Amino acid sequence: MSEIKIGIIGWGSLLWDPRDLKISKTKIGNCSQDIWHGGPYLPIEFARVSNDGRLTLVIDEGINTDIQSSKSQTWIAESLLSSVEDARFDLSIREGGEGVPTGHVGITSRNESGINMLIKEWLDGPENTEKFTDLIWTNLEPQSNEPGEKWEYGDRCKYIQSNMENKKLIEYIKKTPPTVRTPIRDYAEKEFGWKQDESYIWDRIAKTIYFPKS
């Protein structure tokens, strides 16, 4: 494959709220929809408190916490940009600004480890190499609302309990794709009945997911 094709890995609000992110669309009915294709399984968890108080999903390998890391399927949209540098900048702007860190793995990448290795192994799959030359993703770390404090399973559960009035927090957890199963999500569903908001269409045969535009 000589043509550069860049895939953007998403797992949270990027899927239902891409804003001005430059990604390919597909015509479904009378609407133009952002289509996300099945991506690699990665250890993601509700582990980062955002500026508006949501408990958002980030890559979390469970290091230095009591949370057992588990892998969930992520999703990939094709960037309309043909430069990895431009696509990473575009993703950073969507995620809050130029300084937001992003990760990158390409078909020519070598000696990867950790998360990069998991993504590279997926990219090296025969059917995936035909689709993409490069993959990028938001590379934010777990972060509590109080820097330096412990941030284990119980702490995150208490954070949710203390912020029940935050509608954005509740909406985020409910809208997260059904393929994301984590200890924190299980807790929210069992404790508060926050079931999956089925505002998406998941085509299991085509291995795609999209959120219809209103």
Stretches with model-predicted labels:
Residues 2-214:
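A glycine-rich, hydrophobic/aromatic-adjacent loop/helix-cap motif
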